[in-house]
UniProtKB/Swiss-Prot annotation:
Keywords: Bacterial flagellum, Periplasm, Signal. It is found in: Periplasm; Bacterial flagellum basal body. The keyword Cell cycle does not apply. Belongs to the FlgI family. This is Flagellar P-ring protein. The gene is flgI. One of its GO terms (molecular function) is structural molecule activity. PANTHER family: FLAGELLAR P-RING PERIPLASMIC PROTEIN FLGI, FLAGELLAR P-RING PROTEIN. It comes from Anaeromyxobacter sp. (strain K). The keyword Transferase does not apply. It comes from the Bacteria. Pfam families: FlgI (PF02119). GO terms for cellular component: bacterial-type flagellum basal body, distal rod, P ring; outer membrane-bounded periplasmic space.
Amino acid sequence: MPARPIPVPLLALALAAALAVPSPAAAARVKELADVVGVRENALYGYGLVVGLAGTGDSERVLFTQQSVAGMLGRLGIRIDPKDVRARNVAAVMVTARLPPFARPGTRIDVAVASMGNARSLAGGLLLVTPLAGGDGKVYAVGQGPVQVAGYDAGAGGAELRKNTPTSGRVAGGAAVERAVDFALGQAPLVLALRRPDLTTASRLAAAVNAKLGAGTARAVDPAAVELSPPAARKDDVVGFLAEIELLEVEADQRARVVVSERTGTVVAGEGVRLRPVAVAHGGLQVRVQRDPAVSQPAPFGAGRTVEATRDRAAATEAAGGVVALPATASVQDLARALDLLGASPRDLVAVLEAIRAAGALDAELEVLE
């Protein structure tokens, strides 16, 4: 049945092509879908000084930098009043790092450095010895080394030239692990935590483990967790047991979702997104969407075969307004094809999708990014 026109906005759809075409779900390894509870990174932080700056460090107005310099010199046997510190080649910084799971003493990790005062640039600076503590207050690593900055800040006579953010940088391999996190596999119940909780995925994961290692090995506790019970013969080989599970392939499921970024104009439609029949009035353009069945016949005496296809047509004309019904479309892609011919703004596209969802005609979650 031919479609009737529907008013839609005049906008520029820079990315209607970004709408995903539904496709069969692909299986993924368990290690891409879940993590072992307790096996995770830990955040480290510390306060330090960066020296060797070419006059781009903190000014004397930053009192904590003066106090830090005086305190550091005091530990070296040099006594000085913090008020007398006038060094512009020093900057107070906050140092952060990520402690990988199972990191042993001596392991090198990267650290991030960010200025806390009014330093203009950390380029060319050297991070002095900085203890890095965890949330429990214990020191797990010590950082030190040259700071690498992906930017610059130069100026003279009131003119200034800046690129990126020169007040933050990194020290590659700049920290040595001094203490390992107290955790051992097998001491606590083994649980896999899904990165994207889903009842179907959790059930499929447990079924795949039981099919491979025997019934009762895995049990889906909730959408986010699968509890593992190693067989008696594998209790002393927890690492091998988990490694075998990590390589299993599971077809992950997820809720249908449309993600829209109004700022960049990016639109991504996940698998399973569908539209119901809906009437929309927005702006002063009419969009006609029509999908006709078609048959592709091979040439006489050819080696091909007859296949079923669809012929999509979309047209747009300016109208004075009015509301008419849009026939059911198979997916968001059909709506995108119609809008793609118009040239419509991402802001109006977001409004259309939100209105369709509010009307109950979008069988998916709509997530609008800032």
